[in-house]
Amino acid sequence: MDEITLKALAKINLGLDVVRRREDGYHEVRMIMQTIHLYDLLEIQKIREPEIQIVSNLSFLPVNENNLVYKAARLLQEEFALTDGISVKLTKRIPVAAGMAGGSTDAAAMLYAMNQLYDLGLSRSELMKRGVQIGADVPYCLMRGTALAEGIGEKLTQLPPMIKCPVLIAKPSISVSTRFVYQNLKLDEQTNHPDIDALMKDIREKDFDGVCAHMGNVLESVTIPNYPVIAEIKQQMMRSGAKASMMSGSGPTVFGLFEDGETAKRALREMKRSGLAKQVYLTTIYNNRRK
């Protein structure tokens, strides 16, 4: 095999709680991660030149060692002394710096692709151990589906699949620094923690109303006061018929869950007309796990 094309799927957080701040500055979390059917496309092939070549449809995206795809390729090249080079055509559809693990899922796809291209024989768990060296979300992006993430996000427990439903994605034209969000999170003053255990119970019992009732993201306590448009997008989604709406990760992307496709399509049109978000997509929950 000399070439492979893969979809790198985005994630949302159905629940995100921060447990504590560690002495090393990292925060320990409890999150429910969920894959959705919004994806980047990676067309990967071996080349004779001993280098990593990346081209992208986004001119502002780094295509050097600052790109997680590059880091993933370099990691396996060095570990297995691979002499071939790699060429990657990366077509981005997942919003960048949006709280949807766009860079991490691309890196996960790269690890998976190189394992196939070079017949390295690494299991999914072995790939996940290497993935955490690139980023905390990479192991989950290798796993996919519905999962509880703990620690800094790298300790994963697979959960039963989430009920499939339409998902509306809206990213406003603002940038939110993950570091800023976590640095300004006042855990000692935080009283509104999402009930992650209740959320897991709802998922296991296929209780869609329960999932919607127990969704929550503790990081909204920082982002919404600083970026009111996030709250405005949530309100717009709820007015348009969403059963629940929440910010994903550290933002600024907001998503809404819907019971039926027609309501979701109408909400898509209304969100576009509102002008609140620069990027708007209608997709669905995706439950196929990577083997």
List each language-model region with its residue ranges.
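Glycine/serine-rich anion-binding loops at beta->alpha junctions
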Residues: K89-Y118, A136, K243-F258
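A generic structural signal for short
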Residues: L61, G99, S221-V222, G256
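ATP-dependent small-molecule kinase catalytic core of the GHMP/sugar-kinase superfamily
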Residues: D2-K7, G15-D17, R21-M31, L120-A244, ...
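Residues embedded in well-ordered beta-strands within globular domains across many folds
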Residues: E43, S87-K89, M246, Y281-T284
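Short, basic/glycine-rich phosphate-binding loops at helix/coil junctions
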Residues: R48-P62, M110, E205-M215
